[in-house]
């Protein structure tokens, strides 16, 4: 099996991630923050170390690293925790439904209004798009760092600076960039990311980084193991946002994944871009194939394509039968497909352990599928 769906979740994970998950299941680890016995303290050291490793990747402070279930959970915490009735929100054409659905739900209930920022023909957003769309009640700007459909990377530092020029806080969806692109000094007020994609941790992990200038309302309240004399949710971080037992085995794996990308992240990005550019050149040479996204724009290891006159689901299915795991469809990004003018695409997304031979075989398989109708 050739796995090329790393944008959905990464596979394989580094061996130390697997060992860490198993280690927590096989030895006595207690509930982190609950109890003063050795097993609970040992568990607390794992969560502390993971917060530190992630904070280092972000150039942030550990207590502002909030563990979530996935990136969707982190985005919901930020969006629904921060917005108030009457707010106006800026969003982008490349937003995933993890951003769009919470926003569209609030809009449908009449609580907020939304504007989509204008993008250039290459899919990039310029800082002027923010000044054009801003309104007196604009309370949040949600940016997607890298598209999960085309892999195009937005100039987020310039966009965040532009939003801050109007006093607007920014939530950055780093689902497709965390682990490969540098997330230090982006200026984002909140960063949402999965632990199970580029950070190479297990499914069931995500992070919301909450910066100093924002304080979303917690969506989940309950026991934190701290301030137990009070029936009210504590204000201290990260406890304010982390009620209930954490997913310790998965967090132990995420710690190892975060350490791995801390050492290799830049090289991983270079390698993944090399592989995806190789695939782009191969596919671009086949007249029946349309490849989407600007090959010159900054990018991550994600590429979408279609075959003339064929449904993307059919192509993904034919590839699956040949042993390739690629995703066909809308990739939960309907606005992006409206912008591209597509009904869906086939998506290949590489990881640090993908190989050139796999990319060559995929190119061969697509060339064969084009021949056979
Ligand atoms: C850009 C983007 N945002 C958010 C998400 C949601 O991530 P998760 O599956 O961890 O909830 C994804 C998932 O593919 C994504 O690509």
Model-derived features: where do they sit?
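Pyridoxal 5′-phosphate
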Residues: 1-373
